[in-house]
Structure formats: structure tokens, C-alpha cells
Amino acid sequence: DVGASYFITELFRNNAIICSQIAEQHIQKIVNAIAEGFKQPQFVEMLEILCIVNKKPLRRNQTIVVKLLIEKQQETMVLFNDVETVQRRNQLIDIGDHEANENSLLNFHMKMIDLITKCARGRVYEAEIKAQSLYSLNDILTQLSDPKNLWDIKSLFVIFLQEVYFETEKKVTGLAVNRTVWNIISTIEKVATTEI
């Protein structure tokens, strides 16, 4: 129920005591709702509120949320990270689905990228590794360099890159000399100067 999701979101928002005591099985119920077809941004926001409390990451919940989402990745995530799904994303962009419908698949996708990024915030190794499995450096480069992609999505990927690859608990070896990283930085510079 969408109304219940708004109520629960507000009940948990910035409530460190309740958020730190929520049982994994209750988090699982939210993930199950998403898996059962409730791919709406407010369900992702419920998970986000459990992970970030008063602008501070809650490591336990971050780890639980990303673990549960990855376990049901096919049912819970809209990644748009292959040729076929990128074409679908572009169709949704062309019809303005994200502007016409706050519960659109594109808005869900953006909230999901943001959630995964927030699950890695604060250098949570388990979440970083799982997030890196969702989007490789090449995937991020593709997302950033795609002229059809929305600036809102691109900006989320820049933050994802920062939290998941650069600000990590365990350093990603060879990152400083990785050609893809430098291509990403060059692409960010081009995108920033042409789209801002």
C-alpha cells in the first residue's frame, strides 16, 4: 500500500533508535514488496531512510539492504546496464515518463542508483563490492557518455563513482592508472561543460 509506505517513511525518518532496531525480516518485507512489482520510488525511499539517519550512514542497515536487494536483483532492480535495457530507458526518456509520472520506472531507477550509492557511503566494504558488481567502470563510462541519458541520471553516476570506487574502505588497486577512470573523468568534464 502506497499510503502505508508514506506513513512508515515518516515514522522512521531520522529516528536513529527505531532505524537501528528494525529487524532484518521487516527490511525483507519492503524488498519483497519491490520484488512483487511495487517498483515505485517511495519503496526505495523507505530503504534509504533506514540506511541514512540524520545524514549519517547506519552500517548494519546498509549491509542488510544491499544484500537483500542483490539476492533478488532481477526482481528488485532496474539497472539499464545492457544494450536492450538502455534502449528501453531511452524510450522512457523520449516520452518524458519521468516528468509525467512520479512513480515512473525512470524515477525508480534513479532512486535505486541513489540507494545503492548511499548503502556504500561511509566506506562499507560489503556494499562497495556488491555495488561494483552492478556497475563496472566501463558501465559508468557508458552511462555518462550516452547523449540520450538524462543529466539527473549522469549526476547520480558521478556520486556512485565517488562512493563506490574512490571513497572506499579498501582501495581499488590500479585505479589511478586505469584508462577507463581517466576516460570517465574526461567525459565528466565534457558533460559538465556542455550540459550545465
Region locations from a protein language model:
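Extended alpha-helical scaffold regions
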Residues: 1-196
